[in-house]
Amino acid sequence: MVKQIRRYALFQATPDSEFVKEMYGGYFNVFVSAFGDEGEQWDLFRVIDGEFPRDEDLEKYEGFVISGSLHDAFTEEDWIIELCSVCKKLDVMKKKILGICFGHQIICRVRGGKVGRARKGPDIGLGNITIVQDVIKPGDYFDQIESLSIIQCHRDEVLEPPESARVIGFSDKCDVEIFSVEDHLLCFQGHPEYNKEILLEIIDRVHKIKFVEEEILEKAKDSIKKFEPDTQRLHMLCKNFLKGRRTH
């Protein structure tokens, strides 16, 4: 019997920066490097450009990842409305969806939560997330850990999580850093896929266009010098979720 190839898809909600294209060949390769395993097939849908899988093809995939974006998840842009529609279908199908930053907020919106501008302002740099211990089940895809260090880069946030959500992590900047719904939706406000080089380049870009106050960017650079993200643990956690693995 021929072993069936496990298929996953990235919904890319941001254009590739020149830096990422030059260094990695595009964000798609960054995500596959972080969350992919040998023998899998990963497909790219540039949802920001209106590229979506056909309804009849959704069943072919084991899981989906929604990337970050400079766009607001709470707007009525055509492609965002279409993305929400596709995610609703996947939710009904109980397909695994890993939402990251903008993707985290899209899943919140789809599930009836509230998204908007971050109450405490933009968060850029290395941040520490406190894990809510009593929602972690022993042997689940989520390790028994007290905290996670993650790269942050956002100005919006989940203001009210969906009623059905379990809030797994919070920080001093954001009340809903990580949430899950049942066993098929997992969302991070931060960026498990980013490394320091990608973040530093983003800081330079937003500084040039004055997208964020300079004081915030200086603090971000300082945090990058002082701390390290829990990259390996974050990648393994996301893989465990997408592939139905357990920690023990």
Swiss-Prot record:
Metabolic or biological pathway, per its Swiss-Prot or TrEMBL entry: Secondary metabolite biosynthesis
Keywords associated with the record: Cytoplasm, Hydrolase, Protease
Where does the UniProt annotation locate this protein? Cytoplasm, Cytosol
What is the protein named? Gamma-glutamyl peptidase 2
Primary enzyme class = hydrolase
Q: Which GO terms describe its molecular function?
A: peptidase activity
- Reaction catalysed by this enzyme: an S-[(1E)-1-(hydroxyimino)-omega-(methylsulfanyl)alkyl]-L-glutathione + H2O = an S-[(1E)-1-(hydroxyimino)-omega-(methylsulfanyl)alkyl]-L-cysteinylglycine + L-glutamate; (E)-1-(glutathione-S-yl)-2-(1H-indol-3-yl)acetohydroximate + H2O = (E)-1-(glycyl-L-cystein-S-yl)-2-(1H-indol-3-yl)acetohydroximate + L-glutamate; 2-(glutathion-S-yl)-2-(1H-indol-3-yl)acetonitrile + H2O = 2-(glycyl-L-cystein-S-yl)-2-(1H-indol-3-yl)acetonitrile + L-glutamate; (Z)-1-(glutathione-S-yl)-2-phenylacetohydroximate + H2O = (Z)-1-(glycyl-L-cystein-S-yl)-2-phenylacetohydroximate + L-glutamate
What does UniProt give as GO cellular component? cytosol
Recorded hits in PANTHER family, A to Z, give:
GAMMA-GLUTAMYL PEPTIDASE 2-RELATED, GLUTAMINE AMIDOTRANSFERASE YLR126C-RELATED
What does the record give as the active site? 101 (nucleophile), 191, 193
What EC number(s) are associated with this protein in UniProt? 3.4.19.16
Glutamine amidotransferase type-1 domain location: 17-212
Q: Which domain of life is it from?
A: Eukaryota
Q: Which Pfam families does the record cross-reference, listed alphabetically?
A: GATase
Functionally, this protein is described as follows: Involved in glucosinolate biosynthesis. Hydrolyzes the gamma-glutamyl peptide bond of several glutathione (GSH) conjugates to produce Cys-Gly conjugates related to glucosinolates. The gamma-Glu-Cys-Gly-GSH conjugates are the sulfur-donating molecule in glucosinolate biosynthesis.
Q: Which GO terms describe its biological process?
A: proteolysis
User: Where the protein is mainly located, per its record?
Assistant: cytoplasm
